[in-house]
């Protein structure tokens, strides 16, 4: 089954929320292959890797992850990428 990445810039947490709840929110949507936290261009970025049958299912899962994480924190930017031979190829929304 193909792999995909939801790449989210995550900024301000909602009042009373803890940083680890961002990961919990993503994991509540689907089984994740991996989870990564990084700083990119001075902003916190999380990457949730998951599998899907095809691009359409991946887009639906990405939207669900984004919606779930937005209950915990502001997400000013989100992108979906297909993983092909270990490299990310961004998909149009």
Whereabouts are the PLM-identified features?
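Long, contiguous binding/interaction regions
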Residues: 1-93
